[in-house]
Swiss-Prot record:
Subunit structure: Component of chromatin assembly factor 1 (CAF-1), composed of MSI1/p50, CAC2/p60 and CAC1/p90. Interacts with protein kinase NPR1. Interacts with RTT106.
PROSITE patterns: WD_REPEATS_1, WD_REPEATS_2, WD_REPEATS_REGION
Gene Ontology biological process terms in this record: chromatin organization; chromatin remodeling; DNA repair; DNA replication; DNA replication-dependent chromatin assembly; regulation of DNA-templated transcription
Localization per Swiss-Prot or TrEMBL: Cytoplasm; Nucleus
Repeat among keywords: yes
Free-text function comment from the UniProt entry: Acts as a component of the histone chaperone complex chromatin assembly factor 1 (CAF-1), which assembles histone octamers onto DNA during replication and repair. CAF-1 performs the first step of the nucleosome assembly process, bringing newly synthesized histones H3 and H4 to replicating DNA; histones H2A/H2B can bind to this chromatin precursor subsequent to DNA replication to complete the histone octamer. Plays a role in the maintenance of heterochromatin. Independently, MSI1 is involved in regulation of the RAS/cAMP pathway via sequestration of NPR1.
The protein, known as: Histone-binding protein MSI1
Keywords: cAMP, Chaperone, Chromatin regulator, Cytoplasm, DNA damage, DNA repair, DNA replication, Nucleus, Repeat, WD repeat
Main location: cytoplasm
Amino acid sequence: MNQCAKDITHEASSIPIDLQERYSHWKKNTKLLYDYLNTNSTKWPSLTCQFFPDLDTTSDEHRILLSSFTSSQKPEDETIYISKISTLGHIKWSSLNNFDMDEMEFKPENSTRFPSKHLVNDISIFFPNGECNRARYLPQNPDIIAGASSDGAIYIFDRTKHGSTRIRQSKISHPFETKLFGSHGVIQDVEAMDTSSADINEATSLAWNLQQEALLLSSHSNGQVQVWDIKQYSHENPIIDLPLVSINSDGTAVNDVTWMPTHDSLFAACTEGNAVSLLDLRTKKEKLQSNREKHDGGVNSCRFNYKNSLILASADSNGRLNLWDIRNMNKSPIATMEHGTSVSTLEWSPNFDTVLATAGQEDGLVKLWDTSCEETIFTHGGHMLGVNDISWDAHDPWLMCSVANDNSVHIWKPAGNLVGHS
């Protein structure tokens, strides 16, 4: 089961010796492995990360959505926040006159003014209750951010109302625009579920519909999948307690949900009971396709391919990665790969249709796969504890962000000669 790092202590002594040695070896080889690498250490680990779709071309500044996870030690520090980082793409590198023969690389002009080497916190939003398991911005309006909470609710925030001068105020008043919270729904699945644990419920994941603005999908540890329309929000009643649809799974926790990118009604869900299911918002209660025979140990993540939405990837706690043709999910996967240990999440590249990234929940590795040949093409080994989330950048095709339980936030780009980019 994906525990979201909640049983991990963050002391250096908790890091196994072999991982410390692996990190030391990795660090010595970073100049050969990366075209760009920026490592940051934060006060608290983040359970989520996502590059924003915008880019400041004058400074090559990227924005990243992150969170603070305190494991209930300091609830007042539980936040979602937006940080900025420049990858220095705007800097004009100097001529051969400034080629450094010792390091065998070009250096910028001495007069060049560099931006901060570290993440700069731009806006912080106090998370009102519980811990933020996953945060994602609305694709049609990135100022709107949804956070899945360990208290079972989904909180919706408006970034424009949380400037730096309002942080203190936001902690006093309600920082959220809308709260989505409903244990009952209008539709129930035909399969029974164990309701004895319904009082112990977390919102484990969420996903925005790319085709219908304001349509939000959420998964829950009590076995429910819920679909929300945040356009039901009103200033007088900011709490929406009735989802459009509430579907019970196979009786076990739902770990992840994802919309088909090219369709407004089809979505997939994966469960602790090893099920990967395809569902249709229009039918509301029937699974179109489902398979629970090809995974073990609980399926932690599932994602549709952006370029070919008939391909669905899923990964489980034993490290198995399956690729499905959703037209034949009752059959064997079209491809199977092994990450090695439990996979916390996976993400298809939005730029290359066969490239997929998996995040190791236990080994701390992010692996990039070429699924056309079912081979690993790059491994990021800079984290010393489990990786919680990963994100691809929309502007730089190979740029990634990854966050881990060792309080690290890494922004990195593999060397072109290793993955085949110029």
